[in-house]
Amino acid sequence: MSYSLAQIGMEAEAEVRVARAEVSEAAFTTEGSRPEEAPKDFFVERNGLRFAGTHLILDLWEAERLDDGPFMEEVLRRCVEAAGATLLHLHIHRFTPNGGLSGVAVLAESHISVHTWPERGYAAFDIFMCGEARPHAAIPILREAFRPRRVTIGEHLRGVF
């Protein structure tokens, strides 16, 4: 298990180096020139507030397919696409013997994480996104995919100032 975690970490570090190189190249018009515009901080401005991002907390009760790893991966990918976010890395881990899942979609705009307890029909999702991403767009996808009988949703605006 530690080998797979180290391997995941190495892959993530390589992806970050590539992303940094792409950002560095895109920020300049020619070598040694000034950036075309000031760096963007990806904070959100909405209703007169400026904040780091929107953090949604979803609890799904009496939900289906909470032990299906490939399905969970597909659903998370659809959530990322619907939100207009940029997927950097996706990992799902399946626990035995109950088949619970823990997963994370690492995004350029932050993350989506999930933990499931199939024996209880319960799933906990965190969706945190900054910039122009639309985290609320993931909610109907999760409802349709897992068909919960009860859903609770909390919203927290992170980094308000």
Tell me what each language-model feature is.
Residues M1-F161:
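Polybasic/polar functional segments that serve as interface/processing modules
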